[in-house]
Amino acid sequence: HIDGRLVSAEYDNNICVGLDILSPTGVMGNIYAGRVENVVKNINCAFVEIEKGVKCYFPLEADNNRHIFFNNKNNDKLNQGDSVLVQVIKEAVKTKPPTVTTKVSLTGKYVVLSSDIRGVNISSKTKKDEMSKKVQSLLLESLNTEKFGFIVRTNCKDVNESDFEDILKEAHDMSQKFENILQRATYEKAPVCLYKEKPLYVNHILGFPNDYIDEIITDDDNIYDTICAYLPENER
């Protein structure tokens, strides 16, 4: 730790190839039922309250009109007073507020659930990989993707068919988690936090291929316990 912030370092052959300093109190990745405070057309943005007194910036140029509203609507545009599903994609910086998007996602080791797509896509880095295509077919056959879709992560190019059960379980668990988030929003009044994202260091670890990591070292018992909770038992 440095001044209360977490330091994450990645080493390859004893050479530091990555260094991140993470805030332990950040809201990055958290999902909210946000309340639209106002829409400012002349600067092409909206401001969305995610917690009492916490307003976020929403750039309208990123708007794809595929919003999930929790109030009665007769159009798909953001309007003042709307209750809408948002996710924080950028932390506050000095005087700038956090940035949110309505393209909500949940990230796992093998797949990403996205509210912005339907069906199952493959990561652009592995579109031609045969194992990734097999995982795509598996998910298409097994999952309902009418409300949201999935992206097969790069990690899947290194899996075996013996991993398919774990991949399916992760995708099913994500589907249930997202449904629970939507369900909770029906009885919680905006603005309210519906889901807190995994710590950034956990997402960083889960993003590596199965055979990439030899060892994880930490001097913090809480971080150790958190990492163990997210890693499969055979990888601890």
List where the protein language model places each region.
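A short macromolecule-binding patch
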Residues: 54-68
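Short alpha-helix capping/helix-loop boundary micro-motifs
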Residues: 69-74
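OB-fold/S1-family RNA-binding modules
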Residues: 1-26, 30-36, 43-44, 77-236
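Nucleic acid-processing catalytic cores of prokaryotic defense/repair systems
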Residues: 38-40, 51
